[in-house]
């Protein structure tokens, strides 16, 4: 059965919770794909051989999506987190906007074809931070207010706006308040289909640049009816597993009417210099308890981010079944 529009599902079916896939980048790495590249998880798509039917890498990507779907995911993401035009044009042979558009179209069609018409597809857009690797500090230099966020996002955003295979645009892991305010200032001509913003929040429940969730909610409420009508959900991603339920609860208290999404990482800590993950923390709770708290606090899309695997998604799916 073909999916109903995502906006209709979120707005008119308040009891329905969607299961998102896990962290695609780190899961590909687990499966032996080399993502140690300035374009990170988009690296496999940049080689011509990926597009040949016999490609081994292509098989690995398909197997990953297949395993997430078997685990219960009914909304999946394109592997385009670090496929912004700047990173791609500076680091690959794709140099023009026309070639870039063909590149994104190929990734999206490949993903849609593989997941089918029944499931939802998110067009993943990583933050400006992804280009300079500071998702977990939010340190955008001395003048974050002067960065041309629109110029940075525009080529990828325009592509996802017009691509009918994309149901929902996801701005992921946003760590800086200036960037967040920029995205929230764009009207329906600039973001013309449903979108969400995933905030990158630390263990003290602050945006990585130190902004409180209260300041963020005051800003959102202050936009009143000027807010882009396509903003469908707010949420957090790549926050640590142990803190995620508390962070979501706070967000829900500040923005009670807003549908939320949450997809924490495994709780390990990323070292950007070594590009490795460290110190697996002991999980305070299991997925079942955590997912119940998510559902009780307004979560409508639940999944995993970096270092979560199909096994995590299966546990999330069975908890969602039980509690939603
Ligand atoms: C650094 S957060 C990365 C999110 C992205 N969707 C991925 O897992 O590939
Ligand atoms: Zn992540």
Swiss-Prot record:
What the entry lists under InterPro entries is as follows: Betaine-hCys_S-MeTrfase_BHMT (IPR017226), HCY_dom (IPR003726), HCY_dom_sf (IPR036589)
A Pfam cross-reference name: S-methyl_trans
What cofactor does this one take?
A: Zn(2+)
EC numbers on record: 2.1.1.10
Catalytic activity of the protein: S-methyl-L-methionine + L-homocysteine = 2 L-methionine + H(+)
The GO cellular component terms are: cytoplasm
Q: Does the keyword S-adenosyl-L-methionine apply?
A: yes
Describe the function of this protein: Homocysteine S-methyltransferase involved in the conversion of S-adenosylmethionine (AdoMet) to methionine to control the methionine/AdoMet ratio. Also converts S-methylmethionine (SMM) to methionine.
Further comment: Present with 606 molecules/cell in log phase SD medium.
Protein name (database record): Homocysteine S-methyltransferase 1
Species this chain originates from: Saccharomyces cerevisiae (strain ATCC 204508 / S288c) (Baker's yeast)
Taxonomic lineage of this organism?
Eukaryota, Fungi, Dikarya, Ascomycota, Saccharomycotina
């Amino acid at each position: 059965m073909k999916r109903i529009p995502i906006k209709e599902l979120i707005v008119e079916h308040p009891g329905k919770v969607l299961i998102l896939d896990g962290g695609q980048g780190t899961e590909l790495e687990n499966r032996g794909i080399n993502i140690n590249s300035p374009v990170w998880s988009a690296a496999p798509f940049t080689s011509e051989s990926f597009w040949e039917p016999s490609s081994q890498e292509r098989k690995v990507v398909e197997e990953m999506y297949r395993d997430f779907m078997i685990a219960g995911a009914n909304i999946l993401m394109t592997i385009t987190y670090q496929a912004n035009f700047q990173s791609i044009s500076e680091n690959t042979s794709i140099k023009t906007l026309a070639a870039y558009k063909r590149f994104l179209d190929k990734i999206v069609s490949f993903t849609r074809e593989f997941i089918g018409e029944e499931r939802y597809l998110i067009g993943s857009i990583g933050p400006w931070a992804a280009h300079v690797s500071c998702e977990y500090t939010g340190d955008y230099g001395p003048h974050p207010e002067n960065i041309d966020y629109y110029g940075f996002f525009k080529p990828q955003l325009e592509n996802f706006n017009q691509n009918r295979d994309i149901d929902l645009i996801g701005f992921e892991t946003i760590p800086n308040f200036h960037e967040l305010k920029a995205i929230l200032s764009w009207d329906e001509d600039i973001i013309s289909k449903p979108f969400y913003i995933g905030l990158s929040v630390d263990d003290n429940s602050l945006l990585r640049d130190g902004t409180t969730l209260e300041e963020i909610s005051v800003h959102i409420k202050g936009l009143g009816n000027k807010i882009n009508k396509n903003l469908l959900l707010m949420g957090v991603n790549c926050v640590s597993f142990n803190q995620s339920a508390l962070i979501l609860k706070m967000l829900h208290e500040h923005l009670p009417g807003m549908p939320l999404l949450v997809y924490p990482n495994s709780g390990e800590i990323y070292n950007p210099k070594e590009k490795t993950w460290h110190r697996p923390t002991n999980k305070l709770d299991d997925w079942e308890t955590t997912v119940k708290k998510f559902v009780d606090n307004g979560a409508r899309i639940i999944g995993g981010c970096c270092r979560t695997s199909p096994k995590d998604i299966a546990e999330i799916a069975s908890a969602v079944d039980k509690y939603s």
